[in-house]
A protein has these predicted regions:
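Conserved cofactor-binding/catalytic machinery of classical short-chain dehydrogenase/reductase
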Residues: 10, 35-38, 50, 80, ...
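Active-site helix of classical SDR
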Residues: 87, 91-94
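Alpha-helical substrate-binding/gating segment
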Residues: 118-121, 126-135, 141-166
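Conserved beta-loop-beta element that borders a ligand/cofactor-binding pocket
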Residues: 55, 98-121
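SDR active-site strand-loop-helix element
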Residues: 11-15, 51-57, 61, 113-115
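NAD(P)H-binding glycine-rich loop region in Rossmannoid oxidoreductase-like domains
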Residues: 1-31
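Short alpha-helix in the Rossmann-fold core of NAD(P)-dependent oxidoreductases
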Residues: 29-36, 40, 52-55, 91, ...
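Conserved Rossmann-fold NAD(P)-dependent oxidoreductase catalytic core, especially the SDR/UDP-sugar
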Residues: 38-85
Length: 166
């Protein structure tokens, strides 16, 4: 019931089709864009003042580009152009645009996290020897990754810090 929503202070929205090739392009785009819009709309209508969203490194257009695409500059930062070629990256750009619009309309804190390739602790021993031997294997991820524990800390910091807007 809606009466219980008054006790919710923050929404952390990470639900989505998490990458390409898990669903059709149209389903990936529609699922991710509509779910983000619906979360933003419902949360702001209920007066929730903080929303944390999962965006992605794929917004830069390097990760799932057809052929080799290089970033326009390195290190890549939040001001780097977002020009993805794939439905997943496009859906994340659309989510960021919606988040900025909702933030401007409501004044809520809405934080979109452009998360890099998430690595679990056991994957260091399994994957990283190959990455060290051939760094080009990480090119599509702009040589970046985030440890699951660091991602958890990032979300925790977002929960603790108020007033950043978008």
């Amino acid at each position: 019931p809606l009466g219980h929503a008054a006790r919710v202070f923050v929404i952390v929205h990470f639900a989505a089709v998490p990458r390409i090739l898990l669903a059709t392009d149209a389903k990936t785009y529609a699922t991710n864009v509509l779910s983000t819009y619906n979360v933003l709309e419902a949360a702001t209508r209920l007066g929730i003042r903080k929303i944390i969203l999962a965006s992605s490194e794929t917004t830069y257009g390097v990760c799932f580009a057809q052929g080799e695409r290089r970033p326009q500059y390195v290190p890549v930062d939040e001001d780097h152009p977002t020009v993805p070629e794939d439905s997943y990256g496009m859906s994340k750009v659309a989510g960021e645009v919606a988040a900025r619009c909702f933030q401007a309309r409501t004044g809520a804190d809405i934080y979109s996290l452009r998360i890099n390739n998430v690595i679990e602790p056991h994957e260091y021993a399994e994957l990283f020897p190959a990455f060290v031997a051939d760094p080009s294997l990480r090119r599509r991820n702009i040589f970046a990754y985030i440890d699951t524990r660091d991602l958890a800390q990032m979300v925790q910091r977002c929960l603790e810090v108020d007033g950043l807007g978008y």
